């Protein structure tokens, strides 16, 4: 009578769920405080997490450890779920320092336990998740569309840049070479014009030096061929002269014959002192032995006969006496040992000097042919206004040396045709 039955007793939490389940190694945890918070429903019980949600459809996934629990704690800032053990790992109980929310980075991270989610809460949460997924899909599709448009624009630029039209031909000329034409190309892309670098620019920068070097090499080859031809001509002239006129040996001093011995002598075959070397010897000896006052050309341009050197041409013997070789630096005297004769200087001195001991380069040069005749040799046709240039001339380039060697060959042949021999009067 008047007694009332008390209210419904709340279902308590099992003692085993008030302790961590060993997901993390917690060292500094106050077990009494944790138990009190779980029993007062301020924290979610420490349930054993499941790896798969197929066992129960009402399990929730923790976004930190990716395990499924019957209930989770809720963040006060963003209402994100988190299990009790992950929360203890994020914010230890013995520290008073504020911790940021791992989801929204809000300072002073704190959670609350609301129990198991209702159906309404689950549907709202699923709807929000669906909206987030759709937004992510739209962003992904937009990114793919932008990438596709970018590739199309790039392909259009490449196709427009490949339309190259030849504008005009640029002609290049080089010395001692034939002219050739290289077409320059121009490509138009939108509003700018660019010239192709391969056919036009590289041709301007590299073609001319390349052809110049090529022409120089060709000229060197031509010079070598000309030198070989001149050498062959020189040796053939030497051989033709040596067939009819045997070559004498070294110079030996002999006594001059008396006038009685001179009379019986008749003009004999011309004795020559051939060149020991070919083209190179002639050039070297000519540069070595020419006197400073000699020149190789007329000062007057009316004469057609070239003058090369005074010691190259034969001299006439007038009045029964030998003429002096005026152009010789030391009044050379030619002596043939087989004939036992010598050429005397105007001063009456006898000389047995050689014309030259040899060129500096090691090539022996015996001198030009010294041919004398007893009044039968014609003199060279000099012009009336002939004058020798006082300047000293030396062939320096290969072309000049070739010209002088050819001139020596012609002068040598001219001297052999007009000479009859060396005879004593």
From Swiss-Prot:
Expressed in roots, shoots, leaves, inflorescence meristems, stamens, pistils, spikelet hulls and endosperms 4 days after fertilization. One of its GO terms (cellular component) is cytoplasm. One of its GO terms (molecular function) is zinc ion binding. It comes from the Eukaryota. Signal peptide: none annotated. Its main location: cytoplasm. Pathway: Protein modification; protein ubiquitination. It catalyses: S-ubiquitinyl-[E2 ubiquitin-conjugating enzyme]-L-cysteine + [acceptor protein]-L-lysine = [E2 ubiquitin-conjugating enzyme]-L-cysteine + N(6)-ubiquitinyl-[acceptor protein]-L-lysine. A zinc finger (RING-type) spans 62-105. InterPro entries: Sip5/DA2 (IPR039301), Znf_RING (IPR001841). GO terms for biological process: protein ubiquitination; regulation of seed growth. E3 ubiquitin-protein ligase involved in the regulation of grain size. May limit grain width and weight by restricting cell proliferation of the spikelet hull. Possesses E3 ubiquitin-protein ligase activity in vitro. This is E3 ubiquitin-protein ligase GW2. It comes from Oryza sativa subsp. indica.
